[in-house]
């Protein structure tokens, strides 16, 4: 299925309530200041068109959701969607997720990290650009609270198997745990737009969930 072009958001629309730059985030980190309340915090790396973060924020109103999207056009699209759907418990950061994890999010503050259909960077020479590289996986592990979870989905088998190998080699996260495919009754029942396009095209989606132990090993 062909990818539909993303809508350009009017530059005059005020998105400031749902769209931040990394330098606009509280320092030192204070999620209660950012969201106006204290609540369990979930992070999505690469929010794309915003289907997951918008649906999750609506489904779990007692959680806060922070999405990090490096593409300016996509970040603005996500923020506009969150505002239109009144998702006051979700905010998009336009920036590099690795840098946000490293410089802004403290250790053991996230209840979940979601990474759905990241860019596979097909050429072998470009794979070092993948978001789920060893140093980022270690950052994710350190930022998860004990009992926190990592959710990773992709339609690229090589990316899936190599990432699972890296997780086993570079982290102490428990898993992978199987994630069963949920039947979709309508087009909004998919996790992301990419999942919808992949499944409707008859292609396989690879899914895994990992959990941080209550007493994770040091190092």
Functional labels for PLM-detected ranges:
Residues 113, 140-141, 150, 163:
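Class I S-adenosylmethionine-dependent transferase superfamily signal
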Residues 126, 154-169:
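Conserved class I S-adenosyl-L-methionine
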Residues 162-165, 169-219:
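Class I S-adenosyl-L-methionine
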Residues 146-154:
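Conserved beta-strand signature within the Rossmann-like core of class I S-adenosyl-L-methionine
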Residues 132-146:
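A short glycine-rich, Lys/Arg-flanked "PGG" loop and its adjoining helix->strand segment in the class I
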Residues 40-99:
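SAM cofactor-binding core of SAM-dependent methyltransferases
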Residues 103-112:
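A short acidic, Gly/Pro-enriched loop at the edge of an enzyme's catalytic core
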Residues 1-43, 51-58:
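S-adenosyl-L-methionine
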């Amino acid at each position: 299925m062909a990818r539909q072009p993303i809508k350009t958001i009017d530059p005059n629309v005020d998105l400031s309530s749902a769209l931040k730059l990394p330098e606009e985030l509280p320092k030192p980190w204070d999620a209660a200041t950012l969201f106006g309340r204290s609540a369990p915090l979930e992070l999505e790396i690469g929010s794309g068109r915003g289907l997951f973060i918008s649906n999750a924020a609506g489904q779990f109103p007692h959680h806060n959701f922070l999405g990090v999207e490096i593409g300016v056009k996509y970040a603005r699209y996500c923020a506009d969607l969150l505002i239109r759907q009144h998702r006051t418990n979700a905010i998009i950061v336009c920036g590099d997720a690795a840098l946000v994890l490293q410089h802004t999010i403290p250790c053991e503050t996230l209840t979940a990290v979601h990474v759905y259909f990241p860019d596979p960077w097909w050429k072998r020479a470009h794979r070092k650009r993948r978001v789920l590289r060893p140093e980022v996986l270690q950052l994710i592990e350190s930022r998860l609270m004990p009992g926190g979870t990592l959710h990773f989905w992709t339609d690229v088998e090589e990316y899936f198997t190599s990432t699972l190998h890296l997780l086993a080699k570079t982290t102490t996260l428990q898993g992978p745990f199987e994630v069963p495919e949920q039947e979709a009754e309508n087009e909004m029942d998919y996790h992301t737009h990419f999942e919808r396009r992949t499944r409707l095209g008859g292609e396989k989606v690879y899914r895994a969930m990992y959990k941080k132990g209550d007493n994770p090993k040091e190092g």
